[in-house]
Amino acid sequence: MICTKLDECVKNELTNQHIASCTNSNAQCIEVSDRRSYVKCEERKKRYVLENTQKSHVILYKVDGGVVLQDKTVPQGMCRCDYLFVIHGEMAEAIFTELKGVDVAHSLKQIEGTLTQYKSFLSQFAHVYGRVIVSSSTPDIKASPAYVNLSRKLRNTYKGNLKIVKMQFTEKDTELSM
């Protein structure tokens, strides 16, 4: 099942209300929704940590298995990333995060697929970023068409960027665009 109420869910979370009829049972989707100093997602020793220096309200959504719950309504082979950070500060920002083993090329497809699926939802954000955390050394794929196209799309369409990092990455909210 693909959540069609993500926009409504974000607005309700920011006002401490609950969505009237969540099709995905949002307890499975939302991992964090508050102003904590550090918001992290991790799996199999790979970790992304957002340092919330501005104490903005941050909502951490589990995309794969939460916002997009695999069932017969989800197209077979549909690519989606692992997590979505929604930062509600001076400007609304979003970070799509993929925690990946070694197949970096596939992780780029997963972020691309999620961007495509939620294109209209993303129009409300000043910046949208892509983060890939890999378990092996970061391969030199910056010349690959998939990397170039996704990086260009994030930069030109969403005023964001793409970063690929090995194992663990801690990033300040004030340094996302660097």
PLM features: what roles do these ranges have?
Residues 1-64:
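N-terminal, charge-rich interaction modules
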Residues 2-16, 132-178:
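Domain-level recognition of nuclease-like catalytic cores that cleave nucleotide substrates
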Residues 49-88, 106:
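Active-site metal-binding core of divalent-cation-utilizing nuclease and nuclease-like domains
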Residues 83-85, 93-101:
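Conserved catalytic cores of phosphodiester-cleaving nucleases, focusing on short active-site segments
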Residues 99-105, 138:
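A generic structural motif
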Residues 103-111, 143:
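Active-site-adjacent loop/helix micro-motif of nuclease/hydrolase catalytic cores
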Residues 114:
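An active-site-proximal "capping" alpha-helix that borders the catalytic cofactor pocket
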Residues 118-126, 156:
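Arginine/glycine-rich "motif VI" loop of SF2 helicases in the C-terminal RecA-like domain
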